[in-house]
Structures are given as structure tokens and as C-alpha cells.
Design a protein with these regions (language model features):
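Conserved small/polar residues in nucleotide/adenosyl-binding loops
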Residues: 349-350
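Acidic, glycine-rich loop-and-beta core segments that form the ion-binding/anion-interacting portion
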Residues: 224-305
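Membrane-interface loop-to-helix entry segments
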Residues: 34-38, 42-58, 164, 185-191, ...
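N-terminal alpha-helical transmembrane segments of multi-pass membrane transport
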Residues: 1-87, 97-104, 115
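Selective recognition of specific alpha-helical transmembrane segments in multi-pass small-molecule
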Residues: 114-122, 202-217, 228-248, 281, ...
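Helix-loop-helix module between adjacent transmembrane segments
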Residues: 38-43, 111-139, 148-185, 189-213
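Alpha-helical membrane segments and immediately flanking helix-loop junctions
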Residues: 67-99, 125-128, 135-151, 170, ...
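Membrane-embedded alpha-helical segments of transport systems
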Residues: 84-90, 106-118, 167-178, 315-327
Length: 350
């Protein structure tokens, strides 16, 4: 099983080919090859929407929801943020900086801006192709739905099913089940390492909590409405406290980020590719732009205008990477180097 997982990981994140620029080598994984050009294309086509319409993104959170069976734009942001924020914001950032240096943080920011454009397109398409749920009320949808609709448009006839939509739904199910296992495994490992609690007990508590939330109608959204803002604010507050305690070191931290992102030392040493790719890969893994998970939440929103829901999804990417990942990066870069050098696995965070 481990060999199968390792093969899939190398297929998706291993170097598909390598670009050589003098002494600099940049390995390009398959997912980076797919997601970064898509992000650049969407950014240009939307005329740099994440930067241009940031005020409108924030104002869109105040839109009222007249249909109580569907989600408001704010609730879709909460749900999509809950899907985006996870181990990538902690372990991913630690690994990116440990392997690629402080300069990887800059390339995480850059990938977030491209990912925000992708998320905008995903969210807007999910709204345009959402379906009314006759059983539970509200709406449902996502990439499988708009892929199916596009196949119908291409073939110019109604279809009961389409192979591409089924393929996406199948691999999406595998992906999201796997992600939840990664998170639960990290939680059980953390409690075992910190408090010597056997994983079976932590797992039982997690299953019980999940059952209480999932089996009650609308309990998932209500729970996330409370827990996501609280956790984000607390994490941000802790980071601000640490920054204020070390405010004199901040100019050096930002100088280190930009120097190592574009530094001649990294280029001359052939390490520029590691800085660039580790920042980009960890940024893409963290914000999930292009993975197809967040559009399912976007489709559940009432949304008077599809564009508004798309902008809120774009804001979710910026919150995930520009805010939360940066918090982790600042905490790590303010710590003494002898503590942080070489930390590449989840135990370094625990």
C-alpha cells in the first residue's frame, strides 16, 4: 500500500521534467505544470481580479441570504476555508522553509495570487451550474456538475452521465477521504507525542465528535460558523503577539524572505529551483485552488450574482495562504535557526 501511495505522490508531485538555466535547475511536477499555467491564464483573463476587486470581495461577505435552506456567501467562505486550512498551513510551511529557505514564503504568496484567480473561476462556475436539491432543499453542485454540462454543450445533446464528470467525482472522493485521514492521523500523533495518549482513544473521540456534527441537519455549517473564525482569530492573535515581542527582528525577516527569493547566492549555488518550487508546491497544496473541493461549498450558496460567490472563494485562498500560512512562516522565521534548520516532518510542528 505504501508503494502505491508513494507512486501516486511521485506521479503528481515528483519532477515530470527539469528546466536548466545555466547552473540553475528547476524541476516541474505535473500538478504545478497544470495549476500554475491555469492560474496565470485566469489571472490575465480576469484582469488581475484578486488585486483589483479586493474591496468588493470583503463587501460581498455582508450579502443577506433570503433562502434559509441554502448557505449565505459568508457561510460558503467559512466552509471553503475549513476545507483549505489544514496541515498544509503548518507542516507544509515548515517543510517549504526548511527545504527551500525563507525565500519560499515569497513564492507561496505568488502562488496564492494565481490560485485566487483559479478559485474565482471555480466558484463562479459552480454557481452558474448548481442544481436545486429536491430532497433536502437548497442547492448542490461542483466541478462534476459543470464538467457534465460542458460535455453536453460540446456534444450538443442531453446526457444522463459523462465519463469526465464521473472520473472527477471518483478521484475527488479518494482525495478528500485521504485528506481527512491525514488530518486525523496528525491529531492522534500529536496527542500521542505530547501526552502519551494511545491513538485508539483519540480516534474514538474524533469519530464521536464527527458523528454528532455530521448526523445532525445543518450542524456542520453551524459548527464551522463558530469554530473556524475562533481558531483563525486565535492563531492570528498568537502570531501578532509573537511578532510584537520580536518587532525589532521583523525587518531582518522580510529582508531574508526577499533576498532568498531572488538572491544571487541561491542562483549561483543552484538552489533557486528549490526555493521557487517548494514555495509554489506548498502554496498550491495549502490553498487547494484547482482541486475542486471548495466549489462544492460555493454551489450551496444562494448567491444573487455568481460572480459574488466566486469573489468570496478567491478571498478564501488569500486568507488561507497570505494570512494563515504567513502566520506560520513568521513564527518559524522568528525562531532561532538552530531550532528550525532541518525540520521537515510533522513531528517538528508537534
Amino acid at each position: 500500500m505504501n508503494k502505491v501511495i508513494e507512486w501516486f505522490y511521485n506521479f503528481l508531485w515528483g519532477d515530470l521534467f527539469t528546466l536548466h538555466f545555466g547552473d540553475v535547475s528547476i524541476g516541474i511536477p505535473l500538478l504545478v505544470l497544470l495549476l500554475i499555467p491555469a492560474g496565470i491564464f485566469f489571472t490575465i483573463r480576469t484582469k488581475f481580479m484578486p488585486v483589483r476587486k479586493l474591496p468588493q470581495m470583503i463587501r460581498a461577505l455582508g450579502d443577506k441570504n433570503d433562502d434559509k435552506t441554502s448557505l449565505s456567501t459568508f457561510q460558503t467562505l467559512i466552509v471553503s476555508t475549513a476545507t483549505r486550512v489544514g496541515m498544509g498551513n503548518l507542516v507544509g510551511v515548515v517543510a517549504a522553509i526548511s527545504i527551500g529557505g525563507a525565500g519560499a514564503v515569497f513564492w507561496m504568496w505568488a502562488s496564492a495570487l494565481l490560485g485566487a484567480s483559479t478559485a474565482y473561476v471555480e466558484g463562479t462556475l459552480a454557481q452558474l451550474h448548481k442544481k436545486k436539491d429536491p430532497l433536502y432543499g437548497g442547492y448542490h453542485g461542483g466541478p462534476a456538475y459543470y464538467i457534465h454540462d460542458f460535455v453536453e454543450q460540446k456534444r450538443k445533446k442531453k446526457l444522463k452521465k459523462s465519463f469526465l464528470a464521473i472520473l472527477f467525482a471518483f478521484f475527488g472522493l479518494i482525495c478528500w477521504c485521504g485528506i481527512s485521514q491525514v488530518i486525523s492521523n496528525s491529531v492522534t500523533s500529536a496527542f500521542k507525542n505530547a501526552f502519551s495518549i494511545p491513538p485508539i482513544y483519540t480516534t474514538a473521540v474524533l469519530v464521536a465528535l464527527a458523528a454528532v456534527i455530521v448526523l445532525r441537519k445543518n450542524a456542520t455549517v453551524k459548527f464551522l460558523d463558530v469554530i473556524v473564525p475562533v481558531m483563525a482569530v486565535l492563531y492570528f492573535a498568537v502570531t501578532v503577539f509573537i511578532i510584537l515581542k520580536n518587532i525589532k527582528l521583523m525587518p531582518g525577516v522580510f529582508s531574508r524572505i526577499f533576498q532568498e527569493a531572488f538572491g544571487f547566492k541561491q542562483i549561483a549555488g543552484g538552489g533557486f529551483g528549490a526555493v521557487l518550487m517548494n514555495g509554489v508546491k506548498r502554496g498550491l497544496f495549502s490553498n487547494e485552488a484547482g482541486s475542486g473541493s471548495a466549489p462544492c461549498a460555493a454551489a450551496a450558496a444562494e448567491g444573487k450574482r455568481p460572480e459574488t460567490v466566486g469573489m468570496v472563494q478567491s478571498l478564501g485562498v488569500l486568507i488561507d495562504t497570505i494570512v494563515i500560512c504567513t502566520c506560520t512562516a513568521m513564527i518559524m522565521l522568528l525562531a532561532p535557526r538552530e531550532i528550525t534548520d532541518g525540520l521537515q516532518d510533522r513531528k517538528s510542528v508537534v
